[in-house]
């Protein structure tokens, strides 16, 4: 195996993180990205780490599993977390970013590193005799996807992913909405569009009957629960949306609210939330409203939302096919291929789900590719850490029932001793144990 550099194929969240981790360890990187020459159906730019779905990296507190994962990544000097914090926009207890500023930051930070050579080229073959990380994401080009399937000897799996619409803030009718974060956590960062029972019923019926865009595939529609299209939720039952993205709890009317309401109830029957999408607050996305409706139908139905009667859509919601590997049979916990030690895979194609999780897989793959380059022992992060629980889960779960997975405390190893009943106290203890363990690993393995 030639060891003059490490190849990273794909400059998304995982690939950008992997390239950064390798370069900071003094190893030359060839970072291949086809966007700029050839686009995917979902990407709009040629920038690194483009966020094609939401602009939220989810919960920030370490008593939330993804918040703990972010803190672990911060301590491992993640460029993705650094970019997110630099381009953060208000979002209550969540970490949301200005999506363009975020991609700009990652692009500059990675491409300006003296050891990173960016090559705008489509890779159609898997390198055999060089250390390589493939992080081409769920929208891998057909040519390379076919080679990966051929290499793995399996068709792999797929699911459909969806993105929510983005609207112009100037087109919102602020007489019918109010600003508030759920349970008043943090600042009043969300715009809330309240619905009466009658308005909700009409909205649900319109969603159910709205015309969907055709799928570019003969396969059945399979969707990841975390990105369930809003129209699919509406079809699942009357209360599905009320316990999902339109949940009203913690979003009581402010005293000054003068719009329509059901009698004297303090809380709306349903609420649609809008989250700031860029630093200047000129754009907002409709939280949890991933959709596959035709664009004309999106405009018709979503303008039924109070305050959005004249909404101008900067981007309509879209759905795309995501592919992922049979990781339980194909990958090690280090994200190495079981078939070829010098080949790593990272990102959503491995079956981790979510922006933060994808970047975390790139971080682990990058660290271990660098270890292999230097003839050192690879690092297996223990499953008592969030960053170790994900690779353990995707490589040890039952292959027959394997589906994309977000980080949750359910996959982090339980605490020893009697179970602590109070969730916040229990998760605080889990987080403390995880961070203490990670501190020891960083010191022992010289990962800082």
Swiss-Prot record:
Signal peptide (residue range): none
Keyword Translocase: no
E.C. numbers: 2.1.1.74
InterPro entries in the cross-refs: FAD/NAD-bd_sf, MnmG-rel, MnmG-rel_CS, MnmG_N, TrmFO
Keywords, sorted A to Z: Cytoplasm, FAD, Flavoprotein, Methyltransferase, NAD, NADP, Transferase, tRNA processing
Keyword Endoplasmic reticulum: no
Catalytic activity: uridine(54) in tRNA + (6R)-5,10-methylene-5,6,7,8-tetrahydrofolate + NADH + H(+) = 5-methyluridine(54) in tRNA + (6S)-5,6,7,8-tetrahydrofolate + NAD(+); uridine(54) in tRNA + (6R)-5,10-methylene-5,6,7,8-tetrahydrofolate + NADPH + H(+) = 5-methyluridine(54) in tRNA + (6S)-5,6,7,8-tetrahydrofolate + NADP(+)
Cofactor(s) recorded in Swiss-Prot or TrEMBL: FAD
Record-listed FAD binding positions: 10-15
Subcellular location: Cytoplasm
Gene Ontology BP terms: tRNA methylation; tRNA wobble uridine modification
GO cellular component: cytosol
GO molecular function, one term: flavin adenine dinucleotide binding
Entry-linked Pfam families: GIDA
Family matches, as SUPFAM superfamilies: FAD/NAD(P)-binding domain
Family designation: Belongs to the MnmG family. TrmFO subfamily.
Function: Catalyzes the folate-dependent formation of 5-methyl-uridine at position 54 (M-5-U54) in all tRNAs.
NCBIfam families xrefs: gid_trmFO, PRK05335.1
Protein name: Methylenetetrahydrofolate--tRNA-(uracil-5-)-methyltransferase TrmFO
Originating organism: Lactococcus lactis subsp. cremoris (strain MG1363)
Gene that produces this protein: trmFO
């Amino acid at each position: 195996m030639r060891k003059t550099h490490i190849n990273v194929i794909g400059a998304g969240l995982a690939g950008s993180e992997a390239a950064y981790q390798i370069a900071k360890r003094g190893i030359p990187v060839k970072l291949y990205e086809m966007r700029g020459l050839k686009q995917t159906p979902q990407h709009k730019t040629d920038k690194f780490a483009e966020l094609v779905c939401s602009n939220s990296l989810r919960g920030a507190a370490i008593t939330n599993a993804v918040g703990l994962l972010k803190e672990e990544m911060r301590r491992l000097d993640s460029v993705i977390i650094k970019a997110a914090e630099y381009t953060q926009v208000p979002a209550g207890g969540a970490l949301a970013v200005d999506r363009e500023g975020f991609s700009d930051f990652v692009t500059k930070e990675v491409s300006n590193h003296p050891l990173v050579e960016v090559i705008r080229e489509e890779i159609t073959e898997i390198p055999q005799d060089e250390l390589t990380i493939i992080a081409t994401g769920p929208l891998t080009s057909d040519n390379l996807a076919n080679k990966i399937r051929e290499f793995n000897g399996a068709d792999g799996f797929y699911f459909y992913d969806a993105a929510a619409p983005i609207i112009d803030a100037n087109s919102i009718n602020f007489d019918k909405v109010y600003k508030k974060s759920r349970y008043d956590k943090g600042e009043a960062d969300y715009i809330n569009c309240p619905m009466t029972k009658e308005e909700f019923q009409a909205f649900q019926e319109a969603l159910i009957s709205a015309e969907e865009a055709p799928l570019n595939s003969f396969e059945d529609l399979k969707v990841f629960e975390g990105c369930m299209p809003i129209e699919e939720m509406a079809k699942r039952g009357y209360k599905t949306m009320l316990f999902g993205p339109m949940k009203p709890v913690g979003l009581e009317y402010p005293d000054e609210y003068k719009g329509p309401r059901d009698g004297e109830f303090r809380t709306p029957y349903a609420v649609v939330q809008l989250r700031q999408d860029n630093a200047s607050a000129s754009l907002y996305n409709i939280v949890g409203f991933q959709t596959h409706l035709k664009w004309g139908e999106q405009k018709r139905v979503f303008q039924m939302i109070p305050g959005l009667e004249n909404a101008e859509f900067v981007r309509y919601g879209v759905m795309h096919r995501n592919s992922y590997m049979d990781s339980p049979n194909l990958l090690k916990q280090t994200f190495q291929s079981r078939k070829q030690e010098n080949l790593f895979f990272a990102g959503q194609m491995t079956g981790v789900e979510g922006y933060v999780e994808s970047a975390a897989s790139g971080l682990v793959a990058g660290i271990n590719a660098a270890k292999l380059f230097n003839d050192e022992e690879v690092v297996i992060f223990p499953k008592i850490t969030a960053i170790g629980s994900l690779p353990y889960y995707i490589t040890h779960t039952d292959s027959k029932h394997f589906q994309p997975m977000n980080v949750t405390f359910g996959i982090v190893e339980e605490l020893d001793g009697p179970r602590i009943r109070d969730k916040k106290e229990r998760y605080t203890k889990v987080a403390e144990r995880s961070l203490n363990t990670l501190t020891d690993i960083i010191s022992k393995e010289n990962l800082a």
